[in-house]
Amino acid sequence: MSLKNSLNDPQHKFHRRIIVGFLNTLYKNLPKKELPESINSIIIIAQEKLGDAILLLPFLKALNDRFPGIAIDLCCTSYNRKIFEGISFIRNCVSYRPYNLRFSKLIRSEQYDVLYNPKSGPSSTFHHITNKVNANVKVCLNDSYNNPIYNVHLPNDNKKHIAEKYCELLNNYGLSSPIENWLPKYFYEFPSTINDGEYVALKMSAGHQSRKYPYEKWKTIISHILQNSNMKVALFCSKKETKDAQKLKTIFKEKIHYPLNSPDLYHASGIINESVLLISLDTSLIHLAAALQKPIIGLYSNDILNYTRYKPYNVLSKNVKSSSEHIRDIDPKNVIENFDQMINNITKSST
């Protein structure tokens, strides 16, 4: 994905800046303040994407460890609420999208020590929430559009991994990098539905069209795995790749596990956790596998900034970057070479 694409549609981002800039003329601009010496209560606004939600988990764990007994309220979309709502130390987990009465009551009734918005850029939704919340200190990552309605503007280094950027608040309270990956215990409560030998988990698809990888190239990679190891392949795919997955199942028969019994992220976690490694161009599963401490081969575009921010965090990985903005231009030979090296490393470490 090019820098242009990685910014989630420049035209949309431009419109978002226009809206946030207009809101800054309506909302009260806040004076700069110091962070409190200790935090007793905090409300955090979580980003919309699944991968971003997974990357926020290490921060939440570190926050609770640093301030035992802290009251943590977390706002998220209904889409990724299941990731957070079972965490025992989160007091309230409420959806801000779609907007609802429970969320409205919460942000109007509570008084927090700190509001924290860890999003790198502007969001009209986050701006509206921030303006409504009662907090002694409102904290964001430094951004000229965000800054006017926040008291504290933390460093916003785009060369940092997103997991570490989320932890900028805790850097002021003695946290050091790299931060430890973490998943709530319920991610480990769903065993793999595959129980007939070793397998490689492989995610064929991702959300954006520029991240699509051709069927014939997947076929070449899968054929190599099956011919040069005793492992099978467990296929994850979206509805758009269903026909491709079915064709692979027809060709390789019982050596392909598809369809998978993974109706949600928890079941997918069980399958990935018991795999030998993950091959994926979907960063959501890459971040999940990293949190599970599974070896990863990730497929990325030539967008170095995007790679730096969303590569597998703090885990054994070999990643393949395209020569262009499109993942489809990756030569399958490069993936195969990295797979062979990864298997050799895993074999050596286990002997």
What residues fall within each predicted segment?
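Catalytic machinery of carbohydrate-active enzymes
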Residues: 1-351
